[in-house]
């Protein structure tokens, strides 16, 4: 196995995952979203209302990127932005009803993706993969 191709392999896997996610979203009638919106929506599925700052930290993106992504989600009707009662310079983000309706779709797609990723890989190997990828991430 060529160890010097690790970055290319990781990039290829990411591309395949993104393609799978877009295809599955389209099959479920969800259009206009990019895979980068998934991390934001997933965080909001697990946290009712968050500040833009906390959302940026949670998805490990800078605030300007998150602002653009949230703007698209607002335009699509999936989230809304509210002024913070604690800090007038800060905004809160929460799912709309339309955004909440995405939750089961995202969970189903996520479960099917994980099943596909781990197909033919036993639990010991899965743990090894996760451990090694974490080490690679920490090295960078």
Which residues does each PLM region occupy?
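A structural signal for well-ordered alpha-helices, especially hydrophobic packing surfaces
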Residues: 14, 103, 137-140
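Alpha-helical structural segments
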Residues: 12, 16, 45-46, 58, ...
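Residue-level recognition of specific faces of alpha-helices
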Residues: 9, 37-43, 58, 65, ...
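N-terminal leader segment of winged-helix/HTH proteins
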Residues: 1-31, 95
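C-terminal regulatory/oligomerization modules of transcriptional regulators
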Residues: 1, 124-140
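N-terminal positioning helix adjacent to the helix-turn-helix/winged-helix DNA-binding module
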Residues: 2, 6, 36-37, 98, ...
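Charged, amphipathic alpha-helical coiled-coil/dimerization segments
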Residues: 23, 71-131
């Amino acid at each position: 196995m060529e160890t010097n191709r690790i970055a290319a392999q990781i990039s290829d896997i990411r591309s395949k995952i993104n393609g799978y996610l877009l295809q599955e979203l389209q099959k479920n009638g969800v259009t206009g979203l990019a895979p980068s919106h998934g991390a934001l929506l997933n965080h909001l599925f697990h946290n009712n209302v968050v500040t833009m700052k906390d959302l940026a930290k949670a998805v490990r993106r800078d605030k300007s990127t998150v602002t653009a992504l949230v703007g698209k989600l607002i335009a699509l009707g999936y989230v809304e932005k509210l002024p913070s009662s604690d800090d007038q310079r800060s905004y809160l983000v929460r799912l709309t009803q339309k955004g909440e309706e995405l939750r089961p779709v995202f969970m189903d797609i996520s479960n099917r993706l994980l099943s596909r990723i781990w197909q033919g890989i036993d639990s010991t190997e899965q743990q090894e993969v996760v451990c090694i990828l974490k080490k690679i991430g920490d090295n960078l």
